[in-house]
Amino acid sequence: MSSTPSSPLHLAVALDGTGWHPGSWREPVARPRDLFAARYWADLVAEAERGLLDFVTFEDGLGLQSSHFLEPDGRTDQVRGRLDAVLLAARIAPLTRHIGLVPTTVVTHTEPFHISKAIATLDYVSTGRAGLRAQITARPNEAAHFGRRTIPRIDAYESLAAQEVVAGLFDEAADYVEVVRRLWDSWEDDAEIRDAATGRFIDRDKLHYIDFEGRHFSVKGPSITPRPPQGQPVVSALAHWTVPYRLVARQADIGYVTPRDADHARAIVAEIRAEQEAAGRADQPLHVFGDLVVFLDDDPAAATARRERLDALAGSPYTSDARIFTGTPAQLADLLEEWRSAGLSGFRLRPAVLGHDLPAITRGLVPELQRRGAFRRAYEADTLRGLLGLARPANRYAAA
């Protein structure tokens, strides 16, 4: 799905702890004592919904957060510990009406049958606003939590051995998402009859074995949960290079990418579109969102000073896999429009300090984009697929 100046711009925020900067929990607006309370997360999502954002993502993992991508660290001066993202989204769903809820689900070591059921349940309790963000893990210590296999230690993603390991995990992730999608379709939409007079609750002919046999999974099905309200909840994944671009092209509705500038964004979009065509999905809608970490203030100097203060608290300059934007909402709007012209259809923003930068997005950036005619002034659909302009897909097992 390509972006044009007349197509709607989509916005999401990524929720993680007190914010994406490791020093964020020490800011006066942070609420570190509330991190494991449902109300804290409900307040964040309510703020995002007031800003008419398309959806929020909830970060998750199978190990404690770490300053090192590939192994635990011993730090005690940063936020550690999480709530389960899927359960958290389900708790918040009844408190919201329009915004999409997209928990991160680690597809390495977990089972697609369980995740398909969990996300289908979230789609029901949110009345059609669920999605998932599929994520792999290459950390050996996280494999040890399950004891089913080992993953060799990787010292750097750049090595050939590391790339082979990671490529295998992404190949497994593609099979995983395929199983999840087939399980969502294993009940036809009208499989439930619920006729008390005749005593027929379901039509057994409309439940289907999926009989998936792949390199990584063998799953018979059907699911135990009826087909979700959206048919297929929205699937997304973060991608930084060709192998995860291929996962996005094969299986996702949204890919989150991390360009350095507009030219890089244009090249990434072109590569994903080529992979999409190679996968036989050129006719399928696929959003490509840019990921950015944001420090937003009304004065650029204030944003820079705040970032420097947080760096001092953390003990080192903040770095990220995504571009770090420091400036005003108007300057960010300029950047988003520039990158949009490169083919991105939306953006997932990572607030550096949730208590500060999330309201700066909803009360500063959103009104600026609205003034430019680039963002909605009201929610126009009741489902996440509807907000994203994605049609409800037909069931692959239903009789033609």
Feature map (PLM): residue ranges:
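Hydrophobic faces of well-ordered beta-strands that scaffold small-molecule active sites
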Residues: L9-L15, V56-F58, I99-T105, G128-A134, ...
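Active-site mouth loops of central-metabolism enzymes
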Residues: G23-R39, T104-F113, I136, R149-A167, ...
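Conserved, mostly hydrophobic/aromatic
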Residues: L11, A48, L52, I92, ...
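N-terminal beta1-alpha1-beta2 module of alpha/beta enzyme domains
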Residues: S2-T96, Q230-P233, D382, A398-A400
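Internal, glycine-rich beta/alpha segment that forms the wall or movable "lid"
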Residues: S7, E111-R246, R250-Q251, Q284, ...
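Membrane-embedded alpha-helical bundles of multi-pass transporters/translocases
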Residues: L101-V102, V125, G131, S218, ...
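Acidic (Asp/Glu)-rich catalytic clusters
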Residues: P5-S6, A46-R50, A90-R97, D123-T127, ...
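C-terminal helical cap(s) of enzyme catalytic domains, especially alpha/beta-barrels
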Residues: F146-I154, Y176-R181, A265-E275, L354-F375
